[in-house]
Amino acid sequence: MKRIVLCGWCLLLALTVRAAGRIDTLLSILKSNDPGYVFVVAHRGDWRHAPENSIGAIEKAAAMGVDMVEIDIQKTKDGNFILMHDGNIDRMTDGTGSVGDYTTNELKKFRLRCHDGSLSEERIPTLKEALLACKGKVLVNIDKGGDYLAEIAPIIKDTGTEDHVVLKGRNSVEQVKKQLAGYSSIIYMPVADLDSEGAVPYIDSFLSDFRPLALEVIFRTDNFPQLSYVHHIAGSNCRVWINTLWESLCGGHEDEKAMNHPDENWGWVLEQCATIIQTDRPAELIAYLKRKGLRKTAMTSTGKHAPKGVL
């Protein structure tokens, strides 16, 4: 009996160490800005096989091998944060109305819908529950949290996931420094509409005064003068994040086009210095990047290269 218990504890310890090792490895690669490894971010998790922004979607995306899941948050009537893209629950649940009109407990009564509209047995997760589901398994990008940085930072700290989270928004350098004071382990990524007036000064303010690990760029067309600025961003020891979710985010080079013409779309995005890609086709993108030799690099937390297969 003692031997069985001991074996159980050893297995638990091994799994814990392995989980911590995966996050450490991902962070090392992220911070190294190594262009030989392109990060794949699953938009709202694996929503093709579980309801978007659900615990199931997070777990399935992590099992698929993505590096990061993107989740959306909304604030409840009682001041908590839950996962939901829309401001109302009509599309994603068997309920109706605005998120802000319900308490957390009231929202928990509703069932989440799958992408085909059918009802699942999953319930709306809180931000805390989602972070705990990510812990040790996958990095997490929190969207729609730019106005709540100071409120969600303590939740991130309490769950022990400060080293898992990438926050983002359109805040100024001064706003970010003020709202995240005391939370230096949390990564913040600015978002810029690269084809808009004022984009370059905004980007430069972060590159010079904040030195982010990554910067998300959005652009509607693939033919405008400022597009070449991605090379300056990448040359500033900062990863370029591009979304291939739909045409208006990536100059027309989106996921569904990549299904038949991957080089003209995902390949084009890679040519724009992207080393983080948020996608609605994570499995296919991972396979494409592997064929291109852009998922082979792995590093330990000490910065030394580790054997292939760590990730």
Regions found by a protein language model. Give the residues of each.
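Positively charged n-region of N-terminal signal peptides that target proteins for export
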Residues: 1-4
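Phosphate-group recognition and catalysis centered on beta-loop-alpha active-site segments
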Residues: 19-311
